[in-house]
Amino acid sequence: MDRMSRPFTYGAIILGLLPSFRLINTALSNRFDVQLPDSTFQFEYPGAMVSDKHFLPDPPANYLPVENPTLSFWHENLHELHDARSTPDLPPTSDVVIIGAGYAGIATAYHLKKGERRNNLSVTVLEARGICSGATGRNGGHLRPDMYGHIPKYIERAGVKAGLEIAEFEVAHLEAIKKLIEKEKIDCDFTLTRTVDVWINKTAAIKAREVYDLMSSRNLAYMDDVFFSRSEDAENISGIKGAQACATYTAGTLSPYKLILRLAEILVEEKLVNIQTNTPVTSVTPDPRGGFIITTPRGTTHANKVIYANNAHVAGLLPEYQNAIVPCKGICSHITV
């Protein structure tokens, strides 16, 4: 397991948690491992953390959300908890403070409080805007394992074992999220379907076939679900003229906003988590007495542990990651026929 890559791969960075941490998944999977011999929870401390801030670069100046952001399709009908604050003021202290109320942040809070190894930790979630207002509320709503797009790159960079582990992790999300939705009876327009990857470049098609053969040779159970086609069959199956190859496999669609807001609603209804929206974190500093002081425009709060789940904006608080976690703009369209 690559200790350096795990925190960014799965969307959350853990600060101040124990060195024996093993983070398998900060998303909505039962593989999220929070266990310790003393029955608290276990995290792997990121090797890149640097305590001496004199050696750190200055944080990016533009990491806070912009004013008047573009309205996402998912936000046309805002949930009543979108701008929720569990209490009028910030709690003075918490066992755990999670920065970010998107997929990673709310899912982490859910697992800490309602997972198989639930505990009595006090948890506060701080969000710069509304719940699910960042990347989670602005994606295409696809639960689509990345079977080919980046897996070859991961294999080349980190080896076959690491690349296939990421593929297995993504595939496992489908069933994990399906079970979660069924367990909590979440109405989020969830649908299981088939997706198709298409290659119209001959060289890329050959490379895709090599990846398919490599992954198939590993006796991975999920590869039984992948159907790979070449040449004329690829055109007929995909409907794309000139297709040199295609692969189909199970995927899903859902409303990410409805999913995450329902999880947040469950946590709020059961008074398991204190959620504070429109509360951007401007700094996190060690407290000489132990733990950390989190500063916001609304005041400060103390935490024994801090979980960074603010995705692309994490370098604003942890500048040592500014060359490792780089925000990128993308375009996602809602098309009706």
Predicted regions and their residues:
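Central helical "cap/lid" subdomain
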Residues: 296-337
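Glycine-rich FAD pyrophosphate-binding loop
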Residues: 115-138
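Helical element adjacent to the flavin cofactor pocket in flavoenzyme catalytic cores
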Residues: 241-303
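Extreme N-terminal leader/targeting segments of oxidoreductases
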Residues: 2-96, 114-121
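Glycine-rich Rossmann-fold phosphate-binding loop(s) that bind the pyrophosphate
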Residues: 100-106, 128
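Redox-cofactor binding/interface segments in oxidoreductases and associated redox assembly factors
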Residues: 99, 145, 308-309
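Central beta-strand plus flanking loop segment that forms part of the substrate or channel wall
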Residues: 140-143, 148, 194-197, 322-337
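Rossmann-like flavin
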Residues: 154-266
